[in-house]
A protein has these predicted regions:
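Hydrophobic HxD+1 residue recognition
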Residues: 259-265
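Short, functional N-terminal and low-complexity linear motifs
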Residues: 7-14, 25-28, 108-113, 174-180, ...
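ATP-dependent phospho-/nucleotidyl transfer catalytic cores
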Residues: 136, 166-257, 268-353
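Active-site-adjacent bridging/hinge elements
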Residues: 14-20, 111-122, 209-213, 282-292, ...
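Short, contiguous strand/loop micro-motifs
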Residues: 28-30, 128-130, 233-234
Length: 467
């Protein structure tokens, strides 16, 4: 069974202040006509010492954004550029969110509280700086399901409905508004480095690399890696390790992020910033989540390619500090690291003991073929074959029989017909109950089911590239 997050005292540590002058802009939060608490993450609030906040104080901090004690005195809208569908855009940054606070958890990790829908900033362009309530509900569902499936993801920390009528082209409008707070392991994006390259800010690039190496400590590069002692080279090796593992975790989860732009890539390797995400209704490498992704650039099967491409853009930015050869050597590790992560995470979700990369890769290929042939959803597939049970009469079944189970499936949870899933029809039903009847019980019931799934899957593999 999976252990619960470890509680900690409140330990403020706004380290971002050391680089705040050139990485962000102080901004005020929006003033909202209403503050109705819809979700507070009482599972993760203890990890940063905020579990004991009464609801009125919670709303004061996460709806009105009164500063937390000894933390950032004013929110910080972060500056960055980014490739959006591989077209470079220098006119972006935190357009409807900001960094609100930083604190340490029980293990000493620096965690951020950042927002979505908290008002206009210097980077809002034509946007209103707001978030729809439906978007907030979708983010709760995505982060909870990804966490259950072992993905290193941001956590939805708070959702407060704010009483405004919003107009959106991709939702029936007017629609309800909300402000969301996420708990995450940093908000430094690949696009943060791209901005410094575009502005030729070499000293700031050096400082940012040092900040990231200190704040998000990872592994040393391999002993034979060229220039392995250089900070920029070390950082790229670590980010490659993290994003290769992230790509594998999405694939094993059957998850399609939808918008893998460089401004959506956190150098800590944490999955975040959820928009038009979907879960696979069946194993299909061509499946896309975003209705506007007409070319399938960020299709399910192209997600590893997209993350490698994004690592390449980080390498381009780091050319301001390092030679090309050692950076290419770091990028060349992505493929093998991804294959290793796939084997590690695939066997974990099946609840079986790994047999080595070659055998595990053959099992994965046979499993993919089996799912495609049967038109089977990954959630149902992993549930049906957990610990090697019910092996099919095909190549996958033959290979699966040789694996030793590492988990138990004796509990009533594993005897039900199907596992908790997150297909779009159910997401829409959950939202419809809220939208039409202000009925939040389907959401709460779904979250309970998801958390039970996480407990029964047990502790996932540790994210790679982080100490």
């Amino acid at each position: 069974m999976r252990s619960e997050p470890q509680a900690s005292a409140y330990r403020p540590d706004p380290r971002i202040e050391a680089i705040a002058d050139w990485i962000g802009d102080p901004v005020p939060a929006a003033t909202f006509p209403k503050h109705e608490l819809r979700f507070r993450n009482d599972r993760w609030a203890p990890t940063v010492g905020l579990a004991d906040l009464p609801d009125d104080k919670w709303i004061a901090h996460f709806g009105r954004f009164e500063p937390l004690p000894k933390n950032l005195p004013q929110p910080l809208a972060l500056r960055y550029h980014g490739h959006q569908f591989r077209v470079y855009n220098p006119d972006i940054g935190d357009g409807r969110g900001f960094l609100f606070a930083q604190m340490r958890d029980a293990d000493g990790r620096l965690l951020d509280l950042g927002t979505k829908g908290s008002g206009r900033t210097p980077y809002s362009r034509d946007g209103d700086g707001r978030l729809t309530l439906k978007g907030a509900v979708r983010e709760i569902l995505a982060t909870e399901m990804l966490e259950a499936l072992g993905v290193n993801t941001s956590k939805t920390f708070s959702v407060i409905e704010t009483g405004e009528a919003l107009w959106r082209g991709d939702e029936p409008s007017p629609t309800r508004s909300a402000v969301l707070v996420r708990l995450s392991h940093g908000h430094i994006r690949i696009g943060t480095f791209q901005r410094l390259l575009a502005r030729d800010e070499k000293e700031h690039m050096e400082t940012l690399v040092s900040y990231c190496l200190e704040t998000y400590p990872g592994n040393e590069p391999p002993v034979d890696a060229p220039r392995r002692e250089e900070p920029a080279v070390i950082l790229l090796h670590q980010v490659v390790e993290r994003l290769a593992d992230l790509a594998a975790s999405w694939m094993v989860a059957g998850f399609v992020h939808g918008v893998l732009n460089t401004d959506n890539m956190n150098i800590s390797g944490e999955s975040f910033d959820y928009g038009p995400w979907r879960w696979l209704p069946q194993w299909d490498p061509r499946f896309t989540a975003a209705y506007f992704d007409h070319a399938g650039l960020y299709a399910f099967g192209r997600q590893p390619e997209a993350l490698l491409w994004n690592c390449g853009q980080l390498a381009v930015a780091l050319r301001l500090l390092a030679d090309t050869e050692p950076l290419i050597a770091a990028l060349d590790r992505f493929g093998p690291l991804y294959q290793q992560a796939m084997a590690r995470r695939f066997t974990w979700r099946l609840g079986i003991e790994p047999q080595g990369l070659e055998a595990d890769t053959a099992l994965i290929q046979a499993a993919e073929h089996s799912m495609v042939k049967r038109g089977e959803a990954p959630d149902q597939f992993f549930f049906a074959h957990r610990t090697g049970r019910d092996p099919a009469q095909d190549d996958f079944g033959q290979l699966l029989r040789s694996y030793r189970p590492l988990a138990e499936t004796d509990s009533l949870f594993w005897q039900q017909a199907s596992p908790p899933g997150m297909l779009i029809d159910e997401v829409e039903r959950i939202w419809s109950a809220i939208d039409q009847h202000d009925d939040w019980s389907p959401l709460h019931g779904k979250l309970a089911d998801i958390r039970e799934l996480g407990r029964h899957l047990g502790s996932p593999p540790r994210p790679q590239g982080l100490r």
